[in-house]
Amino acid sequence: MNQKLLFIDRDGTLITEPPTDFQVDRLDKLALETEVIPALLALQKSGFRLIMITNQDGLGTDSFPLEQFEPPHNLMMQIFSSQGIHFDEVLICPHKPEENCHCRKPKIKLVEKYLTEGLMDTANSYVIGDRETDLQLAKNMGIQGLHYHPKNLGWFAICEQLTRQDRHAHVQRITKETSINIDVWLDHEGSSDINTGVGFFDHMLDQIATHGGFRMHVQVKGDLCIDDHHTVEDTGLALGEALKLALGDKRGICRFGFVLPMDECLARCALDISGRPHLEYKAEFKHQRVGDLSTEMIEHFFRSLSYAMACTLHLKTKGSNDHHRAESLFKAFGRTLRQAIRVEGDTLPSSKGVL
């Protein structure tokens, strides 16, 4: 399973690097970098696995005997462990630059298995270090690098950057009938830009975003010269996929939502972002169209969305006006979605360990 990994340098990043000889070879030289413990705890809590990777010039030789290296290193590891911080691995290159080995950063020998065995979520893994060699290692690994500096980019700033919610997804779907581009920002409210070519459908999609508490851009070009079938269906598929991607690993979300708004129409919506697609839908309309939207396509839209989003969705409405009945379904779904995508913690809301 791909995991979010942090490859963290030791000297100058986790602990202070002595400016005189650049070796932590005595206990009195050991000092943790500011805020490193609370930052690592928060990063672990948000789902990152920690791997230490360090160059230790001449380790095990007369210039840097093991008996000088081990006491401060072991104490550092004990301190981290006592505070609940655990490293999956500690990767050490003991060679000097002139030995031209294959394991010294920024070369990738030490991290090869993470690149070849599918263990790493490359889009959400980072190298953190205080030297250019750390940034070059990140580049060689095909992941992002963060240049640690206690004043310019310290541990608090790194933690804030990596744990900040920014659930965004972009989906492009192109077929012979439609061309669709959708962007979804689940943690940002504001004006949405929606243009499907079907005015009433645009209004309904805006209801989802407005009542869902998020922002989206939807641009659709479809074969409306025939009818609205492909436009509505494919938009449902693309929007469902975008919502699923934006939710990511779903860690911390409420998962469930239920709403029963009562106005002229009585609409009911229940939602479970379960990974199991299913739709129960009950709505009757007097007319074939509401504005320029076919009423039969409303069910088709929600069915496409629920299957692409991999969620279980129950929708039901009663009322006397077709416009209000249709609108109540989209509003109810938006309000329910708002509940279900809200982040309240950092655990996965499933006893199975996966959604």
Curated annotation (Swiss-Prot):
GO biological process: L-histidine biosynthetic process
InterPro entries: HAD-like_sf, HAD-SF_hydro_IIIA, HAD_sf, His_synth_bifunc_HisB, HisB_N, Histidinol-phos, IGPD_sf, ImidazoleglycerolP_deHydtase
Active site: 9 (nucleophile), 11 (proton donor)
Gene3D superfamilies according to UniProt: HAD superfamily/HAD-like, Imidazole glycerol phosphate dehydratase, domain 1
Pfam families named among the record's database cross-references: Hydrolase_like, IGPD
One Gene Ontology CC term in the entry: cytoplasm
One GO MF term: histidinol-phosphatase activity
UniProt binding sites for Zn(2+): 93, 95, 101, 103
Localization per record: Cytoplasm
Cofactor(s) it depends on: Mg(2+); Zn(2+)
EC number(s) reported in the record: 3.1.3.15, 4.2.1.19
Record field: catalytic activity: D-erythro-1-(imidazol-4-yl)glycerol 3-phosphate = 3-(imidazol-4-yl)-2-oxopropyl phosphate + H2O; L-histidinol phosphate + H2O = L-histidinol + phosphate
Region (Imidazoleglycerol-phosphate dehydratase): 167-355
NCBIfam families given in the database record: HAD-SF-IIIA (TIGR01662), hisB_Nterm (TIGR01261), Histidinol-ppas (TIGR01656), PRK00951.2-1 (NF002111), PRK00951.2-4 (NF002114), PRK05446.1 (NF003937)
Family: In the N-terminal section; belongs to the histidinol-phosphatase family.
PANTHER family given in the database record: IMIDAZOLEGLYCEROL-PHOSPHATE DEHYDRATASE, IMIDAZOLEGLYCEROL-PHOSPHATE DEHYDRATASE HIS7
HAMAP family named in the record: Bifunc_HisB (MF_01022), HisB (MF_00076)
Name of the molecule in the record: Histidine biosynthesis bifunctional protein HisB
Gene from which this protein is expressed: hisB
